[in-house]
């Protein structure tokens, strides 16, 4: 009987739950009212047919669709999307008007290009939606075990599952809907759930059923089971659930601990039973499946303005043309009697010029419509898809360890990669690996652990390498006999004044890595290993330290059947590192039951492990507010212990007077660990007597079982009563390793002119240490720390006082930056989440942004996911420049979606960030190549491609206008309709696509060697209005040259030996030939990099024109019309036709050649110089010259290893100068004293 009561009491405890990952269960507004607004859902358990019988409570099916279209909506919705674009809509109107007599063209010459372009885009949409449909079919066809009645379960597809069904889910299966947990294979009704698909977290969550349904542990138990759930309506909040279960005449409150969400997976549990509460699109995961925000690049936005400019040009020339036609009709039409202007229905009736003007305006708008590039949008889409393919296939962006390539999840933002100004980065899992290694510890005032952290090794090694590159500058320093086993260390008495940071050699680093044989454990100190700790003077404290590590946690052990080793599933990587460390120290956590944990302790006299049981009485969960976790346990001797671990500031303030014996030494050790970039926690304990614990546990039980909005507050108060009078044992130091190549990547990005901000949830000390390791911070950099430490939260007007304090600190910091006279001075801004709350207020945020922009580094600590998104929005909207956010966890989704470009890292925290991102990479270091290489290329390609599009269409379209003016604004086209059909779609589209896909101003290795080239993108050198208008002007010039030369050569004179003169068709064909040559030769001159593909597309397009002209002219007259045998019999035999083409090519390209030659000679751009250096490098023997030119092509930066080394060299030079000055004074003094002594 006593055992049953104990078991019942333990079942009512929620010590298995990880509340640190959830907000409050209930709303802060107060108790919820079931059956009130928002809480009207009624679920009949095991009776799904009742929902079908009652129309008022009919719920959605479990069928899920993520497609944008279906068979009925595809055509109207997709057509709307296509004609939402201004250019496409214009050509739609033009195609409709082309069927009327007003059109100067054959209707098919207008309809066919439009159908081709729109059809291609719609085909792309259909393909993408088909892929989504097939994914939906796969998900909806999954099967689950569903109760059929009479205690029998059968397999049923997910789409046929209904609200109220009882479902049995097996281990490693996904939950098919949102379920209420009824029972599980564990006797206490718990189960372990992986929610990676929901929140991106890979750590297991623990769910627990109600005691009332605990007995439903077999299939037969559900034969007569029934109940009613009354709960909240469907909503997207993953972490709240309010409702109750009516069963057997009793009402039981429900909370999120009983809810199993769709798309989460059952882990470490044989099976569970649950009742379906929400199905299909009512489930929380589907309620959260909002579309990612639509993002458009800056180039695309500017392109819209250029299209509007071309429309203005179109309207202008159309207005001029129609006005000219009206004037000609009024003044001269009477003389042109053969046009029969006397007919009442005639458009050329001189008595009605206004009518003639209006009608001709429509004709002119159709005639000059080729000023608008109809194939621009589809060509850009094709180019961007191909660019994204090359990004995906780049082996330099492939992570061989994880087998993960880079992925361009959207192709709309390729060119935006080349215009980034500010990078906002998460820390854990992004800059660091999120792989925790136990490295050092402090126990009883003694520090243990002799191994250096990887961040120290990486920073020191990189500095030594940079110092070697600057050998000429360092050679002037007083160094000892050269390099010893270290890369660079100034030894001896002379060099002691100029001490550099110690740098470990590659061999030392290799040895250190070889010594690391256990994942999560990089500790090395023989004083604690192999039971040597028993010989330490404070062995009792060391024993308690190890036991706290092994017992105070919420982890789950899993035994590897092959190796017999225990692995651990824990709520954080830190806890895994603690358990691995305790195992290596001889205290292995082997088993957890509903009420106990078992530790195999290996320090007995026999040398064999002894299993000890610790009964868990209570667990006080870790939360971000509490910053600590405690376990109340009873050991085998019957002693009740409170074991506590948490942030040092929290633990230290809860120590008893007698528990502060090691406080001073431990604090010093924590500071040292923090400076080494390590994550720290303090450990303490307290012994409890039975009476004290019984009284407290009664209060704790009341708080645990309470139902109301203040439940969490009650738990916090009760917990706070117990977690005091602690005895300090020591502290841990865990290393969150830097990802491979992070320091070098940050250095190169800084030299490319990019600003880097770090937004992290870690404490300030840890973030600062990682900043030093990455060289975002360095010695000598002036840190501006904005905080609210001096503001009293209890004041009546605390918010106003906080904002006033922040504004004062920002103003003082801004003044300090302005009056700083040292040009090399660098400032770093550091702010925590609490202060950031006020700094992001509307009346403060722009002053805060101005200060942040003036600083070389910005580090925001202890920030929430919402604050990350708000900071990103402020940087994006406040500066007006392109921002990139990069992260790896679910808490980074907000800032990834808010930034202009979101980059997700496919790391250990799940795929939530990747799914929300625009680009995904496996490691932070790949960001350098993604931006500096692919970003630079894509920006320049797209910019040149768009400018060329406008050039070729202006060149072509204006020749029609000139011919109109020449022919009295007749509305007649000089070109055959088939020419118009081919111009944009065939004859000029492939070369421009090759430009957008293959163009390289410099190779990839040179992009990385000369990072300052990247600044051409943020400065928008290739798509500013100066360059755009220059290309347009070039198009106007080319059109004038082509028309005037052809008119002068072919008009009213023979062009063949037989005296034949050129008619309009011959002149039009010759002019069109010149256009094809001119625009294709122009694109060839624009390219800096040729492959055989580009040659084929450019010269093949020109050849295709002649082939078409020859073949089309051979068709019967009914088909070929007025170009019958145009090439073979009329133009080809005439030498003047070929000479005209050569003359036009020379005349149209000479200005461009003159411009580019002048620019390269007088005012070259960076890539021009680098191209020449690269070209002539084979004749350069002096490698130092190459390095010197590389250094010139780097942006001046105040962060990164380069800036760090520069600062160190300036520091050393200053010291040397001061020392030389002292020596000079001393030598001068001694020389003055010598004559006087001689005279005496």
From Swiss-Prot:
**Its membrane topology:** Multi-pass membrane protein
One GO BP: heat acclimation
Gene encoding the protein? ALA6
| Similarity comment | Belongs to the cation transport ATPase (P-type) (TC 3.A.3) family. Type IV subfamily.
Any idea which residues are catalytic in this one?
426 (4-aspartylphosphate intermediate)
Q: Tell me the superkingdom of the source.
A: Eukaryota
Phenotype on disruption: Ala6 and ala7 double mutants are hypersensitive to temperature stress and are impaired in pollen fitness with an altered lipid composition and short and slow pollen tubes.
Q: Which residues lie on this side of the membrane: Cytoplasmic?
A: 1-75, 125-306, 379-943, 998-1027, 1087-1092, 1156-1240
Instruction: Kindly report, in one word, the top-level EC class recorded for this enzyme.
Output: translocase
Q: What GO CC terms are in its UniProt record?
A: endomembrane system; plasma membrane
What the entry lists under NCBIfam families is as follows: ATPase-Plipid, ATPase_P-type
Q: Which organism is it from?
A: Arabidopsis thaliana (Mouse-ear cress)
Function recorded in the entry: Involved in transport of phospholipids and in regulation of pollen plasma membrane lipid asymmetry.
Name the chemical reaction catalysed here.
ATP + H2O + phospholipidSide 1 = ADP + phosphate + phospholipidSide 2
Keywords linked to the UniProt accession: ATP-binding, Cell membrane, Isopeptide bond, Magnesium, Membrane, Metal-binding, Nucleotide-binding, Translocase, Transmembrane, Transmembrane helix, Ubl conjugation
Where's it found, cell-wise?
Cell membrane; Endomembrane system
Q: What is its EC number?
A: 7.6.2.1
GO molecular function annotation: ATP binding; ATP hydrolysis activity; ATPase-coupled intramembrane lipid transporter activity; magnesium ion binding; zinc ion binding
Q: Where is this cross-link: Glycyl lysine isopeptide (Lys-Gly) (interchain with G-Cter in ubiquitin)?
A: 625
Where is Mg(2+) bound in this sequence? 888, 892
The regions listed as transmembrane in this protein's record are 76-97, 102-124, 307-328, 361-378, 944-963, 978-997, 1028-1050, 1064-1086, 1093-1113, 1131-1155
A Pfam family recorded for this sequence: PhoLip_ATPase_C
Can you say what this protein is called? Answer: Phospholipid-transporting ATPase 6
Per the record, ranges on the Extracellular side are 98-101, 329-360, 964-977, 1051-1063, 1114-1130
InterPro entries linked to this entry: ATPase_P-typ_cyto_dom_N, ATPase_P-typ_P_site, ATPase_P-typ_TM_dom_sf, ATPase_P-typ_transduc_dom_A_sf, HAD-like_sf, HAD_sf, P-type_ATPase_IV, P-type_ATPase_N
